[in-house]
Amino acid sequence: MFTLLRCLGFGVNEPTNTSSSEYVPEYSVEEISNEVAELDSVDPLFQCYKHVFVSLMLVRKMTQAAEDFLESFGGEFDSPCCRVYRLYRHFVNEDDAPAWAIPNVVNEDSYDDYAYLREELDAIDSSFELLNEERELSEITDRLNALRFFPVSKTEALPVANVQEVKLISETYQLLMTFINYSDENIPSEMPAPLLDELGMLPEELGPLNEIEDIKPVAAPITLLSEFRASDNAKPLDIVEIIPDVSPTKPYEAVISGNDWMTLGRIIPTTPVPTIRDVFFSGLSRHGSPEVIQNALDEFLPLHHSIDDKYFQEWVETSDKSLDVDPCRIDLSVFNNWQSSENCYEPRFKTGALSTRKGTQTEALLAIKKRNMNVPNLGQIYDVNSVANSVVNKLLTTVIDPDKLCMFPDFISEGEVSYFQDYIVGKNPDPELYSDPLGVRSIDSYKHMIKSVLKPVEDNSLHLERPMPATITYHDKDIVMSSSPIFLAAAARLMLILRDKITIPSGKFHQLFSIDAEAFDASFHFKEIDFSKFDKSQNELHHLIQERFLKYLGIPNEFLTLWFNAHRKSRISDSKNGVFFNVDFQRRTGDALTYLGNTIVTLACLCHVYDLMDPNVKFVVASGDDSLIGTVEELPRDQEFLFTTLFNLEAKFPHNQPFICSKFLITMPTTSGGKVVLPIPNPLKLLIRLGSKKVNADIFDEWYQSWIDIIGGFNDHHVIRCVAAMTAHRYLRRPSLYLEAALESLGKIFAGKTLCKECLFNEKHESNVKIKPRRVKKSHSDARSRARRA
């Protein structure tokens, strides 16, 4: 026991290696010596108890056990055990000790002169989370060796005996060793009965025994590898290579799987891409007749069958027009032929599918007027910078997980140069395209075109309004190849640092089925937001939100300044159709930032209007201008006016349905016993596309294969019933009579290519190809017969 006290800093030996600057305590060494001598004068059995008691105190979690031991063996204030306890509590943690256990043995000011001892004492107090007995013994020994250098007077420092002399576990007291390596199995039977009773009353959380038992056995230890490896000439935070190790990426698997599995495949190339093949489909016991498809279309869209737009473009091109457009320049010398020379199959069903549009000056002007000009000004913002800062701060705290973000450097660096290499794979670009950097290129100049294929019209307005084609504004190839990889790297980083409830389904595999099925089933209300004129309604506020958020993601500031300054005012030219005009902050629908920028704007709007951190919100999905929020209780609507007054957007909240990206979401069981969120395409849009007017013999095989991939989810009666019910409620507000039968007939229609042609284009599809009529020369006999009849 005397040796133990000397290890704690007390003793009576002669001083060695002291300096004159050391603090002189107010008490004398003789007082401590008398107390130590009194402690050593007790009988051997009681000294054994003291050894156990001191060992308990050395384990930080056993403080309560030491107090219980004190009450049973020497609970009186003047007993030797009580004095040892007071001395220990004073040196280890004075703040936690009771008032009676703080004696004036050592002046508290002496700690200020020995900072190294303060650090050791703090380490004793904070690091007793021991995982096994071996580590416990080694740490106790290290701390005892550190405490040996604690001086107690100005002229003397009391040395401790050598490590060989410090024998906490002697042959006489084997009980101490067995107690330090304590467990239910190795408590000796000869231990005194009162001590056994006390041990049996100890709470389970006091010792590290439960932590040891909670450790699960593993087949092999996990090797911790460095996540990044720096190059010789790189800056400290540059990334050269991401080592494909499972352990650093394990926290990201859930968030990557809910967004883009191609990003995870870049980090771990052996990762399999998930599919819906694991979904359990019961199959169809019957197939409907293809003739019911027309009945289903007439039920939902009663006037579509009467509309044939074959000659609509001829009427537009040959009629007088009066357009109210913004300032633009028109080259009237440009004229393009709008007549089509393609030989396409004539569809059998009258679904209201639109014909292909040809790019002409008139079509370009009509599309530009609708998509780019006459921008609505609904917002009421007076200090754009302060509002942008507020919106971005709310977006960062809501969407970004700081624990995931800290794994990345502060900026996108040389490690992500692989995005440039992957982008040009298979493109074989001209080397001259890389001759000039972006700084000397005209980033503010865009080209323009219209989309020839129009989206299906899903409402009953086809007989009232002629749909306009969408427009595309795009850069030259050299600018696209230099800028797209930067935004791809930023998008990958964004998907890696999202919070668990946020999902951005994107990439080659649009993984809506990776949404958390448990969170989806726990949601009873779904907030679907339909933004109108989303691209052209964006103004300076959206411009600043994107710039500051992308800077936070690590895109270099020089590139962001160059890019967004060029987007303040841009020149757009459609030289093929002879139309030239300017735009300011609105979205360029074909540049490298279109999808990522729209997604950032959508998330910023949602975060500012709704409290997405509320536990009531179970999941949030954002993809471009589409969004869906699942909640337990209905979201408050008192701030939804901010979509219009603050963000200058026309927002509609049509239905309480799990619908996003033209897909209905339902949960389905899997063959492995789990469940998954299954996205099913909008049935009404599929039925309209069955009457496509642009299918010919050259593209039929690809068109047929795309349909096989689309209708794979309709191989189950439960899926068909659920989706048909949601579609009928969405468009009719009542049950449908024909939709289920029409969806059941899809499997029969696409059972084979020959049958598909017979069902959709006619029984003999070869004779159903458009053939230009040719003039037949009339014979003289025909002329004589007509004259005879006359």
Curated annotation (Swiss-Prot):
Listed name of the protein: RNA-directed RNA polymerase 2a
Q: Per the record, where are the segments of Basic and acidic residues compositional bias?
A: 779-790
User: Residue ranges of the RdRp catalytic domain?
Assistant: 524-639
Question: What is this enzyme's class at the first EC digit?
Answer: transferase
* Organism per entry: Alfalfa mosaic virus
Biological process GO terms, please?
Answer: DNA-templated transcription; positive stranded viral RNA replication
Q: Name one Pfam family in it.
A: RdRP_2
Q: What are the start and end residues of every segment in region (Disordered)? A: 771-790
Which transformation does this protein catalyse, written as a reaction? RNA(n) + a ribonucleoside 5'-triphosphate = RNA(n+1) + diphosphate
Q: How does it assemble?
A: Interacts with replication protein 1a.
**Family per record:** Belongs to the bromoviridae 2a family.
Q: Which UniProt keywords apply?
A: Nucleotide-binding, Nucleotidyltransferase, RNA-directed RNA polymerase, Transferase, Viral RNA replication
Function of this protein?
Answer: RNA-dependent RNA polymerase which replicates the viral genome composed of 3 RNA segments, RNA1, RNA2 and RNA3.
GO MF, one annotated term: RNA binding
Q: Does the keyword Iron-sulfur apply?
A: no
Record PROSITE patterns: RDRP_SSRNA_POS
Its EC number(s): 2.7.7.48
Q: Which InterPro entries has this protein been placed in?
A: Bromoviridae_RdRp, DNA/RNA_pol_sf, RNA-dep_RNA_pol_alsuvir, RNA-dir_pol_PSvirus
Q: Which domain of life is it from?
A: Viruses
